[in-house]
Amino acid sequence: MKIIVLMMMLFAAFSAVVLADKSIEDAALDTVMDRDDDKKECIGHMGWCAWTDGECCEGYRCKLWCRKIIDWLG
């Protein structure tokens, strides 16, 4: 009986540590992701751009989806 109680207490302690670690990790990621809020979002290579408000990234143009601008004449 003592072993069962000990195992339950160890399981509860381990679960608490894991949950605390996960919440700290999520909080750290939230602060990192918030730094890019000032950047304008753009649609990258092969991203659907037709009939949307988004614009293609620099060096791409919209022809149903964002395609790379190729300068054939050099």
Curated annotation (Swiss-Prot):
Question: What GO molecular function terms would the record report?
Answer: sodium channel regulator activity; toxin activity
On tissue specificity, the annotation reads:
Expressed by the venom gland.
Please state the span of the N-terminal signal peptide per the UniProt entry: 1-20
Q: Which cysteines are joined by disulfide bonds?
A: 42-57, 49-62, 56-66
Q: Any idea which UniProt keywords this protein has?
A: Amidation, Disulfide bond, Ion channel impairing toxin, Knottin, Neurotoxin, Secreted, Signal, Toxin, Voltage-gated sodium channel impairing toxin
Q: Which residues carry this modification: Leucine amide?
A: 73
As recorded in UniProt, coiled-coil segments are none
Family recorded in the similarity comment: Belongs to the neurotoxin 10 (Hwtx-1) family.
Instruction: Tell me the domain comment.
Output: The presence of a 'disulfide through disulfide knot' structurally defines this protein as a knottin.
General function of this protein: Weakly nhibits voltage-gated sodium channels Nav1.7/SCN9A. High concentration of the toxin (3 uM) inhibits Nav1.7/SCN9A currents by 80%.
Descriptive protein name: Mu-Sparatoxin-Hp2
Q: What organism, scientifically named, is this protein from?
A: Heteropoda pingtungensis (Pingtung huntsman spider)
